Amino acid sequence: MMSKLKTLIRNKFRYINQIPQIAHYIQNDYKSPKVNLGQIQSAANKYKKGIKNLADVEFQVFSQFGDDGIIQWLINELPIPNKTFIEFGVENYKEANTRFLLINNYWSGLVIDGSIENVNSIKSEQIYNFYDLQASCSFITKSNINELITSARFDKEIGILSVDIDGNDYWILKEINRVQPVIIICEYNSLFGYEHPYTINYKDDFVRGNDYPFSFYGSSLRSAIDLTEKKGYGFIGCNSAGNNAYFIKNDYIKYLSIPIVSAKEGYVFSSFTEAWDKEGTPLRGMDKIRAIHHLPVINTDTGEIERVDAEAIINSLQEAKKMKRF
């Protein structure tokens, strides 16, 4: 009896001692089965014919929504010479647009976040040693973005630039002149609609949710399209979640089966909610837009300060049948 008890205790301690090893494999998700599933889906998308919409190729591995699939399809279709990316606003990089690209395709990249805790977390991961990744801690502003990009020592033409800083996205993208990405992924705020050229006013230390509602940030799709057109890019659509817009350098559009589309054609109203009422209940449909009514924005056509006209945006989206629910 005592012998059996000793054996039982010994076995339990053996399992306890394996916990750090198990945790190690869970943390280092580059070995995760979901990477293999992403590889299978990416291979399947190569054989799809007649792709006319980015939604047709979406899948998710590490991206917040279906952007991993869109990115994989684009890099398989486009003859991108330099396999490099820059992504900022990555937090701890567990959920990001370029993580699967790094692990699956061995691209080289620079990621930037304003939190030292997040950057230290990235640097402590195995992927920081196993792949060609640089992580920089900096709160991005118009005055430092080009210097931060230059520090990566990439060629001027890079593969992907992913912009998602929940605030000054338009102003930072406008300022960038040290690289010419083949693909630009830029977050937009669908609550501004597709017709209005709106962005929040620039503020060096803007932090989402500090001075205004949490859902008040970034720029409209229209403003992002106008800006990238001036930089030599065509708009090809948005992800199904309604938060990321995709732009392709004009020289590369010919390699894709999907055409350049207008803001109205490519606009997607966000499926998620980032606005709540006083009781903490999530706002849906038109109520999300009303939550930012009359807040100050910059008209990127005129440079003048305007106020968000929620009802005008709602009417526009209803007429275009762009809202799933009212």
Where are these predicted regions, by residue range?
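Short, structured coil segments at secondary-structure junctions
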Residues: 104-105, 179-180, 231
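Short, hinge-like loop/turn segments at secondary-structure boundaries
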Residues: 127-130, 152, 179, 202-204, ...
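A short, conserved alpha-helix within the catalytic core of class I
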Residues: 167-180
